[in-house]
Amino acid sequence: AAAASGGAQSAAMGRLVPDTLHSKALEKNLYGDTPDRPMLVYLPASYATSPGRRYPVVYLLHGFGGAERTWVTLGPVKPAMDTLVRNGTVREMIVVMPSGRNVFGGSFYTNSASTGNWDDFVSKELVAYIDGKYRTMARPESRGLAGHSMGGYGAFALGMRHAGDVFE
């Protein structure tokens, strides 16, 4: 009843945590986009109760025109993850949903002299930040990428460019 009324969440449910990362890779973009990049981080239910446990991470990249909240406003990531974990379809994991939005609506997660180094932001800074702040399994075989539209392109391109060293 508490979860349904917006009160305390059930122990069987994960939670969404807003976070922000200041990106050196995006500081010098020519259009004045902020290098402070918002994200949402889904933490599984056991994250709060199992302090010694580490988790694999999936980086979920949104499409053109979207932002970090797209996955929770247009797609039910949190309830979907809670259900998939509860049913045993997937194991518990951390899901990171960073904003790849820029002044043009989307970065395509590639490095650019004009819009900033988005590949470096995701593959170097974001991964290092998440591994440092959250209890991740900090190795390529425990990291995955997924995305929709522009994010699907980004997931494919980043996965290919950084296969074995960052993602596997």
State where each predicted segment sits:
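Non-catalytic cap/lid and distal C-terminal segments of serine-dependent acyl enzymes
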Residues: 2-168
